[in-house]
Structure formats: structure tokens, C-alpha cells
């Protein structure tokens, strides 16, 4: 089971959208780079200045504005295709077909149709042989793709099957290929850099390239720069009479004809340059309806862009109503002047044609590859080549036309010589393919009169279709075959024929997705089969067909009454058919309107009951059904009540709490969102939920099963930000809405721009499917334009706005009484229990989440609760929470929303509980902050530098601008925070329709200051400005995309708060705040809100705190005064004794001193100095001060009073209290920014309910490239100069990809002479040997270095990061925008050309850089550690017995200033430093005493800061941050300098993200958060492209072969996979077992590596029998060598240690576990802490020796005491020393000599065998024993070990961990017993078992009784590794799955053993009859089933 990543088509198709300028589509996908889809495809741009000019201009969209034709008057947006990118082009091929048009309502008259038909004939008469090219694969996948192609207008000739269109193309396609791809990307088809080398190249990339996938492209088209514009203008001038068909008109308008009359176009009378050519055989969509629908298509195309589709029906169908609107995200209406045929109409046409492609012709548009969309057919024209015409008469004329076409463009005719025959051959081969003639024969068979003949034909038709695809079925006559099959389907008497006919239709839709438009006609017949079931097979097959149809044509099914029919006999069907039926139901509910409710009403009870079903897929479809209904009816209160009437709420509530959960994360989010929507729009449902005890449910979902009162410690269960967001939204909606007057009036401004007035009514227009859409300005203009052009009229209607009555503020208070408020009054008990249950939880969620979206929601919910709770209840609820300090920190936030909320909360609390809070607000600093706000002049405009990008201390990293910029951008639906408006009080900031599901689809805020003119005429822009709140507004695609990515548009509000006011112009372009709504609105709103804050703060102070004059008499100040006094005593110049420390201890541990008081007393800084200062002036030495501190806070002895025995102080409570207080201070003060892209996930009901978090942005990276100019560095002349012009580079490519690109083209060769003769012609000459080298090794010697400016770029940095960090142009942006405000950097990054210099690597530098981890100079690190020391020391040690003193690790930490590796600034820095010192003291205090017990005072876990952890986790879950390598510096620096702030798993993730390449980091992220991957990783770059190398090893020589594998692949970046000789198993299991077995082999006694005792294995297998292994209960440590050991033996042992280093590093790198029980001192060596090893560490190696050493050390201490005793005479001293004994023996009598205990041949110094140990040299002896055992004797082994390790990646990356944690990192979790509850939560029963199955319960019971050895056996059997990863079963990936092993009825399960699939952790368990038999069989299998992988 090889886990090889598939070459997923999605990944590859992606590139076609890459062309930044649209001028060079580089579709690697479509193959041109056949031999090497490389990881670096760089695109040089044209050299010819003229050509370059035009293409450049076109790229930037500055086409000379000659054409003012109305049709294309809109802005020229260059990157239409970009925005469109995530559309079909991106889908894996399989998916591309699932979209097909919905032709259900066809409101057009027959006469029109006839008219069109005639015209069609007329046209075909004119062009008798339109091209037969059938586009099928990605060549034009999706309308969007063809549009893009067209728009690029490159001279792109699509040849028949494209493989070698013209010489020129061939040549130009070549530079884009790179033989030396990294295998990784090769496999994944991921080209990272793209070539746009010349005009030809630009075309070829999109055309010639088509070959590899043998697309038959859509014909040929030619780019004619300006001339086209003229032509277009002239054509539109001669605008045809209105009588002409819309189609023709469109053509004349846009020049894109779909039935291209070639002869006429090219007759001599036509001046060629003027032509605007379209793809030749464009489809005849004449049969489709006239113009009107084009509008729909047009809008659709405009909005298409980010519409994500995926295959599974639920995830796929964004609702129809939505679809029309949400597409707005795409490019703006004003598509582009350059849009050639696609300007106004093209997009529409594209869509229309795809839809209608040639329905009538026998050749069938089916094969045209544009992915169908659900838009209505037909629309304003503008051709896109969905080719197909009947069998074309003359292929020669095809060729002739093609040739004429190319020559017209200026291609030399002589190129046609060699190509001609090939071309026609290709034409013939594909188009005249056998398939269509075979289909014609079968068609006759289907129409025969003889049933047996019909049956035979239909069976063969099935075979033809099931084996076919769009390529092989070119010209399949769908139009004729479908009616024939429908006829057969009605032969009620012949089940066989019906069944096969039904199958054929299903297969046809699979193979030719476009055929579904025709198959729609079969819906009534399919439904008949379900209404009266005569043959169950036919009925089930009909369901399958309907399910496929429902993905595109759900409306047709719904209106035919199909929903009820499908569910009619649901229970009779097999489970798969049931799933299909429910999927159909879900799809039918997708865009249902209130008028269609009656179609579903009767099925609701059945669906409701279905929620209790066990089948996961059924339940999910049912949930999807309800979620879509609620979404679509959200403003129809009566319908919502009907939907929720039959037990729906109860069933869903039960569904949410089922353990283990049935719902996936995405579904869970959707269901909770559905509840929120119901509650906000229908308060009676909220009341019903409250009565059903929803509070307990929510508490359970957030905190897990509660034991005891909820007031106690609240531990949240881990949930994704989306889940938290939805749950808090629901809590918020269950409470009544806040009023909208008084202090809440300001919310209106926070909610939306005041410019947005919600009218009482909205106007809507009807599209061709009869769906109504609200008007907005942009739509209106397009509609008007199209209606005019097509002579169409459209129905419009006026509809009361559901939102209007809730007033502009978006609250629903103006409605009649809120039922929730009634409930609060009528049932206070219920309200009370609700509030008590959830307040603490909400509070905890607020404190622990870092994403602004969640925090804003929480804040709303808390405000509602506080507002509606009465005083008594409040007192009760609040007593356990430090509300005041939270309010204080919220008031210092940079986010206006948070500040406003905090002021409102303070006001409510002071009104309700004045006596309590008047004291707390003073002590906790609330009053201080409020006064600050009241007095501040420039309120919040320029926060102090330190926190510019900081967050409010509640961690809201959002910042001021957020509140208002968003305030204004109301309906961009973001509200600056995804308050994904579905609640009334913070909601309804949706569009007039307020549909949740559209929200994300329209996240387009036009923004762009300085560059605006390029994209759109200013006047347009200004018009749009006021309209920016209109949800559907979009502006130039690129700008809007950037805007949408600006995290402000999600919940990460921009942090450069001030920029808005200070530099409007710059902000406009950069941070994306301006242009979001008219600037005035923004600044007005900001100013208004600031004004409100200031005024409110002022009133607050007046009202509550003006009475006292605060002369210090206030009791609230007592603690502060005491603390200040004590702090002053901590004076270093005067010895204040320990009294001040005692006072501080009592303040900290007994009083409730607040963080505010600690901050303001100066205590932190003073204590830090007291503990660390080491200056001459100090009155008392630092050591004494530290001991005093320990005495006071830890009751250790005072200086000078140490006892002789062990120092074992007890009582760490005061120190613990101090640490907690400091941590609280840190949480309140820190303002670390979090860069997250945190909008709540997708359209709740549109299907792709995925975690959309960074995927939008990732798509952006996939579709945009950086423009770089490669230049030889001025310092060097001995490499070639790059002459290829600027190149386009994938932003996520690594710098080494550029190196590879250049080196394999010969730019890495250093030349002696300076001939500059060779130019970039050499691109062709790729050096194959170099390419292969790059391909096969992870470790090629670097040849070139790269610089941006003066900065040397690390090879493993992404180009994007390099440009962003070092590019000079980036500097000037740094001030106004940083990652925090815009993760994609400023637009400038994407438009400027960045210069990257290259020069050869100097010889002397090479040696340092050879390592994968990109480490530099490792060569020095290891040896320097020992060698210089050794040189001098060896003599002293050997001759004189002098060993280096033990270093005190505490020294390093005792510094009052930040260490040099902390570079960030933050207000909390002093607190961090103090905590660092306190942690060091707690950890290493015993180094201050000779004889202290070696244990921590406070466990490290007590230092963890939950707020920083929440921020870190949030940061590390963001795919975009990881893909761009954009981890904030504070996180990596704190992780290494203060690891104690974060728990182990957070640091482990941080380690993987920073230590390795991006793909590994992503892999790790996906392993830990599988839901990120749910939707769209396959076609975006989220999916990591990890290369895998497979090796086969022989079990008999495992160690030897493992060494050679590590030698070859140890330092390779590929993942290593192992297979065993003569065994079939491959993949994860054998690989894990390999590491475990090699670990075991390394413990063999005969290798002589370890200290310990020899044992044999208890369960030996094969060669293990009779082998002795070393065991050491304390953990393994290297066996020491003496000075006299044999060099050969030493060399062998060093080799093994070097190998061990590589093995361990590789295991860490590949997420594998080793099974080596290493001792703690081993890990200290790994972390370079060997110099601080002491006698304490001997305990972890050899406890027996360690105990003796301890006793002897006591004797040494007594001896010192005696010697210091002044009263002793010489004689009495001598006597006293002789009486010192150990166990009654004097030292001399112990008979020790100077050799290492246990190793008589290792002398501790020269001649040590002959030196006896006496009382006088005892101290020297003990020092030498410790030094030799832990350092000297083992240093050579460890140096080799570290060398081996560092050849894979640098050891310095392990600084995130403490030595005792490395065991977890390397070997997984510690053994502990397994409990049945955990097993139940973490293991998945499947395929025949559920959690209630007897066998599963038996299994859990057996597993929970296993001892350690049995656990290891079981794990090794099931997973391949005897240890679980950290986190135990929870972290096992994939999870342990228990499936039922099936048998024949004659066989008895008790006779069989269980078997496993280790790759996916499947345990195949027979259903044994008793638990005893199961235990016995399991143990036999586990023991015997080791070490072999055969098929079970």
C-alpha cells in the first residue's frame, strides 16, 4: 500500500490560471512540459521590445483606450483569470464534469427556438465545416478557463490534438520545462516557476501545451493587440438591427463568434488585422434560449470565481439562488477591455455555450470541455470554443484555415512543412474516432423493433460509456441517444432493458457531464420508477441517476415532485440507495424558495426521524437538507417553525452529543449554525431550545462531560476556531437581544456604515430560471446593457425587505416582544440555570481564544448575559472570575469593538453592583484605563510603538482600524470580524437577502488606491465607492481579491490602526482599509466611535469616581501602598535583610493583589534586578540574595546554615503564588500579534462546509506569481548573465528552486574567461546529468548564492518570504502594512519586478552549507565542543587529574536584560524575563547548594501561560502562515528562550513548522487537524508534496542494511519507506516496524555500545533467539572508553553512534518513532548540556554507584567542615579525619583505586591502577569518577552521534524541548494503562461494527486490562511500532479502526485469528463468541504476527 501522492489532476490543472497577466497561461497540467513537470518552471518574458511592450501593457491591463464601445466600456482588469482561478480549472478532472446546466425552467417560446434553429442552419451553411475539435480535458476546462484563454488573446493556436502545433510553439514550450524537477513536485505536477519567454511561448503554454493530455483544444484563436480593439469598435459601431438574433448581435459586438464563419472572415475582402478570432468550432448553442439568460450566465461568470466545487453532492452544490449572487466574488462586471470576446458577453457566452453546447448535433457538446455551470443557458454572446459540428466534410479545409490563421498572425509558412501531416493525422485520429461511429451503430440498435436487439445494443452502449471519457467519446450523439434510452426506460414489461437503459444514462452523465442537460428530460420517467416499484434494481439505478442529475438540476427534480418520490420507499432500499435518496433531498433543498416549500413539507417528518439513524452519510445528508432549508427560509418565521416542528430540535440536539460523534467537524459547524439562525430569526424556537435544556448540551460540547458543579475549574475540550465561533454564536442567540439605545446606540456604528440605509423594500429581477435576485448597481448596469443588446425585457418585482423592519442597526428589537425576553421574565429559574451553566464557559472561551472572530462573539454573548441577569445572579456568577482585570485589559485593546464592549460592560456592572465594583475597578486598573481614555487626545490613533501591531491584552490582536473600517464595510459581510452575521443583534449585516451562505462568497471589498487607474476608470470607482457595502460589488478582480484576503475582511482586523487617518493614500493601496467604503464614512465612523468612547469614558468617571479626590485614603489602595513600600526595600545598595521579601511573600500569597497593582508598583523590574544584578556596588552578593529568596519563598536554609545531610526543603506555595500572579500580569500586558486568516468557515449550507481558513489565501498564492528579474551579481563576471528577461516565480517556491532552474541551464558553471557569448538560447540545453542529480538527491552541493540587495537568501526560504522580507521596495511599505494587516503583503509585491542577484558559491563556504536543514557551519559546532578543550585539558586531566569544573546552568538565565535571541518588543517583556528567572531558579536551585535534592521546586507545567498558548496554537493552525513560513518572530523566540510558557504539543508543532521544510510542516498540520483538508486541499497547495523513497531490506541483515539505507537517504528530504524482502506489505506499518526493529538491534550486547545488564528477549522471533540484549532500567547510556582502548574498536563504536544519530534525526524528520529507552544524561548530551552533568545524573545511569558516591560526598563535606573549624588543632583534626567512615569503614579500608567503578581497565588518571583512594584525595577521586562516567569516557561516542544527527538537521532546533521531553519526541508516549472510555473516544468501529457491538466492547475491556508488555505487543502488531505517539491513541493517525472479519456461513469465527492492515491501523476482528476466546486469539496473533507483512 504505497502512500504515494497521486498526481492529482487538480494540482496540475491549477497552473492554467497562474498567468498573472493572463498573457501566459502556463498549463503544465495540460502537459507541454511532458518530460518534466518541474518544480521550477520559470517564465522568461519577451525580449523583442515591441512585443514585450504590448504584452506587458496587456498584462497590466493598460490596453490603449481606443475602444469606447459600450460593450466593453468597463475597467480593464488584468487578472480576471486570477480571480476566476479557483473555478473549474482547478478541479480534478473527475470533478470537472459534474457541473452541468440546469435547464429546468425554460421560459422561452418555441418561435424563438425555431428562429434560432433556422439561423443555425444558415450559419452552418456559411461555414460548412466548422472545426471538429472537441475540447475535452483541461484545455478549456470550464468556461472560466476558456474565457481566460480568450482573454489572454495570445496568439494561441489550438491544433487538432494540439501535440505539436507549430515549430515556434514547440520551441517556446521548451524553455518552460525543467528536467531537473524535484521528484516531489514532479509527482505532484506542481510547477513553481513559469516561463513566459516570448510571444510564441505565451501562446504555446496554453496551446501547444495542450498536447500531453491530448486535449483537442477548442480551435484556434489569434491575438491581435490593438487591432482587435479597433475591429471590435468598428463592429459594434455597425450595430445590427434589433431583429437579429441575440447571438449574432453578441458576436458582432464582441467579435467572439461561436459559429465562426472562417471563409468569410478570411476572404480577401476582410482586412485580417482587424479580425477578432474566436475558437473555431464554437458550439452551436442556437438551440438554446435567446438572450435573456445570457444575463444570468454573465452574472454567473462574473461571480464564479471563488466558487468551489467538489465531487460529493453535499459538498458541491451551492444553492442556486446563492449561486447567482455569490459569483460576484469573481471578477468585476467590468471585466476587461482586454477581454476580447469575453469583455461583456464573453463570460456569459462561455457559460451559455458550455451549457448549450450543440445540443442538437449528433456530435454533441458533451465533449467540449468547459465545465458546466448551473447558470441558465444562453446569454449575451461572445464565443468560447465549445466546438462541435456535424462530421466535418473536409479536414483539409480545416488545415487550410488553420494555416491561413497562423500566417495571418505572421508565422512563417515554411513551418507548416513538417507539421502539416501530423496535424491532420491528429485531427482525424481524435475526431473521427471509432467511438462516435460505434455509437451511431448502437443508436440504430436501440431504435430497432426487436427487443433482443435493443437489449444487446443497450448492453453494449453501457460498456462503451462506462469505459469512455470525454476524450474517447468525441462526437458522441447524446442528443439522439438520450431519447432512445428514455423510450427503452419506459418498457415496463422488460426489466433488463429498463435497468440497462437506466445504467447507460448514469454512465453517460459520468463520462460526459455535459449530457446531463439532455438527460434532464428523463426525470419524470425516473420518478415513475420510484412511485411504483416493480423492480428494485431499476428503482435503485434510477436513484443513482437522479443523484447525479440533482447535482446540477435539483430544481427540475424538486418541481417534478421528486423529493417526495425519492423518499417514498426509503426504508426498502439498500443503504447505498438510501444515501443517494437523501443526497437528492439535500440537493433539492439547495436553493429552494418559500413558494416551493410545499414540495418538501410532507417529507419533513421522515427526514426528521432520519436524524436518529446510525449511518453517518445518511445523517450528514439529512443535516445538510435541514441546514439548507433553514438557510433559505431564514426570514420566513412561519416556515422555520414548520421546519422545526417535528422533533427536529430534539433529534439534532441528541445528534450533537452522541459519543463518539457521528458528525464531521464541518457538519457540526453547519448544524450549530443552523440552530443559531433559527434562534436569531425565530425567538420562539430559542425558547423551545432553552426549555429542552440546551445549556447542558452546550456546556457538554465546550467542556466535555462535567463532573460536579460548573463553577469549578473549567477545562475546554479542544475545538477548532470555527466550532467555537458557531457555539458562542448560538449561546449569544439564545439570549434576548440588547436594546439599541443608551450605551448600546453606538453598536449601530460598529455594525455598518451609516451610508447603508436599509430600504423598506428591495427590487429584484428574475433570471431565466425564474429565480429572483436583488438589484445592485453593478448588476443593474450589466443587465441594462445585455437587455439592450439582446432586445430582451425582464420581469422585476418589489419586495418588502425582511431586514428593514429590524431597522438599520441590524437588531430585531423593533419587532414585537422578543420571546426570549419574555422567558427571562416568566421563568427566572430557567434563565438563572442557563446563565450559571454557560457564563463561566463563555468567559473561558474568551480568555483562551486568539481569533478575533470568536472573541467578538463571546463579548456579545457575555454582554447579553450581564445585561439580562439580575444583580444577585450576577454576583453569584462573577465571584469566580477576575472580571475587572479583564475589563481593564480590554480597555487597553487596540480594537475599537473590544474597547466599546468593555465600556458597556463596565457601565452595566457599575449600575447593577456599584458597591462591589467601585473597589475592584480601582484596584484592577479599570478606572485608570477609563481615565486614560477620557483624557487621551488622539484616542487610540497612535498606540505606543511597542504595541502598534499588538492586541488588546485580552489577546485580541485586532486593532483599531478594524472596528471602524469594518464598521463601514457593513455588508461585505465581514464586519471586520466574521461575526458571520446570523444573529439579529450582531447580524443582519448581510445583504438585503442576508443569506449566510453567500457571505463568504462575496468577500470582495474594492480597494486599491494608487494603482486604481490601471484597473478602472476613476469615475466608476467613485460610483462604486458608496456602494461598496453592496454585497455583490466587486472591483477589479485582483484588487478585490487582495481585499478579500486582507484579514480585516475576516476576523483579523488590520492592526495598523493609525494608518487610516494618517496616510489615507497609502493605506488605500496597501492595507486595504480604505476604499472599503467611502473614505468619509470610514473616517466619520471611526471618529464617531472614538468620540463616543471618549465621551462615555468621561461620563463614567464623572458618574462613579468623581466623588473622592483620591488622596490616598481609599481602602482600595492599601495593598498597592504596602507593595510599593516593600518594593523600595528591595534595594541593592542597602542590605535590607530578608524582611522585605517576607512582606512581599505575604502580599503575594495572602492578599489578592491585582496584576494592575503589581505592574504599577514597579515590583517586577525591582525583583528582576534583585535576583540577577551582579555589579560591584551591590551591598550583598547575588548568591546570598538568591538563597535568601529561596529561604523566604521555599523554606530552604539561610546562607551559611546549610545542614550536613540533604537539603530537602518543602513548601513551594509562596513561589507558586508568585508565579501565578506573574503569569496573570503577562496575560494582561502582552500584546503579541497573531497573524491568522480567520473567517468562519464556508457557506454554511452551500455544501463546501470546509474550514475555509487559509484556503482562500492559499488559492491566491496558487494563482499569482512574483515577477523577478534574475541578474548576475556585479561582483562576479565568471558565470553567464541571465538574458531571459523577467521570470515569473511561484511565490511558495523555495529559493533553491531558482538555483536548480539556473544550474541545470548551465548558469552554475564558473568560467575562466569572460565570454558573454552564450545567451539564453542555452535554455534549451538543459544539462541532463545535473538535472538527474538534483532530482535524486536531497543534498546537492549548492552552486549559486542569491541576494536581494545586500541580504543573502537562505535556500529553504520561500521566494515570497524573501521578497517580502528583503526586497527594497518592500521597505517603504513596512510602515503602513505588515503581515498583521495584510497577509499577502501589499499589492506592490505582486506587481513590481523584484531583482534577485546570483553569484557562485565560494569554495570555502561550500563545506558549511551541505545540509538539508539549511544549517550553516555545523562543521564547527560539534568538534569545537571538545577539541580545543581536549587539547589543553587532556594533559591536565591525564597527568594531574584536574577536571573542568561543573558549569552552573542557572548562570545563563540570571540576566536582567533580554538574551540576544529575543528581538521582539512588548510591554510584557520584563514580566517575561522575571518568569524566565523564576523558572530557572525553580529548575536549577540545587546548583546553589552542595548537597541539595535534585528536584524542581515547581513543576514546569505550572508556568504554562494559557493565553500565549492559545495564541500559539491559533497561529500554528493557520495553513497560510505555515505555507509562507511566516511564523511571527515572537513565537519562535519565546519557544526557544522560554519553552515553559507552552505545553509540549504546542512546541512540538512549532518545532515541525520551523525545523523542516514547508511540506513536512503542512503534513504535520494536516495530521493534527484533519478537517483543514476536508474540502479543497486536493486542488490547492495545502496538500503537502512530500517525496517518498522506497527501500527494500532483508530482515536477516537488518542492521547492516539499515546503515546503508541511512548512508544513502539519511540526509535526503524524501520520506523513507521500507519494505521487506519476500513480503508484500508496504507503507506505514513496515516502515514503523523498521525503526522499532533497528532500535532493538542497536541494543544487542555484542555491539558494546551501552552500559547495563545482558538479558534475552521474552518473546524472541527468528534471529533474535539466543541473542543477548542490553537492558538498563534507568535508560541507556554510552559505555565509557578508557585512554587505552583499541582504535579499531573505538572507530566501530563511533560508526554505530553516527548511524544512531542519523536514524534518530530521520525518525524525527519523518514523524516516526524509535524504540530506544535512552537515559536522561543521553538527552542532555543531545542538547549540549554535558558540562552541567553532576553526581545527580549518575542516578540515571548506575544507581548503585551513585548511592556510594553520595555517601562518599557526605564524608567530603564533613572533612571540609572539620578543616574550616578554627578550634581544631592539627592533631585533633588528623584524628577526627581518620574517624570519618562510610558504613563503619574508613575510606582507606574501602580498597578503592583511581579506576572507574565497574571498569577496572579504565584509569581515571595516568597510573591510576596503582593510586589508592584515601581521605585526602577522596574529593579528587569523586570528581574524576563523575567526569569520566558522564563526560570524558563517552565524549567520542557523543561527538559522532551529534555529527550523524546534524547531517540530517541541526540539533539547535531541539532547543524547544527540555531533556526529559526528548524521550516523548523520539519514542512517543510513556506507557500507561488504557481505559475503556479513552479507547471508545479514539477508536473507530466500521464495516460491520459499531460502538455498541459486543465484539468492540469485549476488545476495549481486554485492552484496558493489558500490562505493559502486552500493550507493546499489541501495538507492534496493529501499527508496526510498539509505542504510541505523544497523546496516546488520540494522536494515532490514522485512528485505530476495528472492522469485522467476515466468514462463510460454514466457518466458525472462533477458529480464526484477527489480522491487521498496519498502513491504516485496521484491526480485522472476528466476532468471537466470548471474551476469553478473544483475549487468547489476540495475544496469539500479537505474539506470532510480529515481523512479517503478508496479505491476510
Swiss-Prot record:
Residues 154-166, 175-216, 948-973, 1029-1040 have a biased composition (Low complexity). The active site is at 1959 (glycyl thioester intermediate). Residues 1885-1992 form the HECT domain. Its EC number is 2.3.2.26. Pfam families: HECT (PF00632). Residues 1496-1570 are annotated as: K-box. Residues 749-836 form the WWE domain. One of its GO terms (cellular component) is nuclear speck. Coiled coil: none annotated. Pathway: Protein modification; protein ubiquitination. Gene3D superfamilies: Hect, E3 ligase catalytic domain (3.30.2410.10), Hect, E3 ligase catalytic domains (3.90.1750.10), Leucine-rich Repeat Variant (1.25.10.10). One of its GO terms (molecular function) is ubiquitin protein ligase activity. Its main location: nucleus. The modification N-acetylserine is found at residue 2. Residues 1001-1014 have a biased composition (Basic residues). GO terms for biological process: DNA damage response; DNA repair; DNA repair-dependent chromatin remodeling; heterochromatin boundary formation; proteasome-mediated ubiquitin-dependent protein catabolic process; protein polyubiquitination; regulation of embryonic development; ubiquitin-dependent protein catabolic process. It is an enzyme of class 2 (transferase). Residues 1-398, 797-817, 938-1080, 1407-1433, 1568-1587 are annotated as: Disordered. The keyword DNA repair applies. The modification Phosphothreonine is found at residue 1377. The modification Phosphoserine is found at residues 12, 77, 85, 100, 310, 312, 942, 991, 997, 1016, 1030, 1317, 1322, 1329, 1376, 1427. Belongs to the UPL family. K-HECT subfamily. E3 ubiquitin-protein ligase involved in ubiquitin fusion degradation (UFD) pathway and regulation of DNA repair. Part of the ubiquitin fusion degradation (UFD) pathway, a process that mediates ubiquitination of protein at their N-terminus, regardless of the presence of lysine residues in target proteins. It is linked to Clark-Baraitser syndrome: An autosomal dominant disease characterized by intellectual disability, delayed psychomotor development, behavioral abnormalities, variable dysmorphic facial features, tall stature, obesity, and macrocephaly. Interacts with MYC; leading to disrupt interaction with isoform p19ARF/ARF of CDKN2A. Interacts with TRADD; leading to disrupt interaction with isoform p19ARF/ARF of CDKN2A. Interacts with SMARCC1; leading to disrupt interaction with SMARCE1. This is E3 ubiquitin-protein ligase TRIP12.
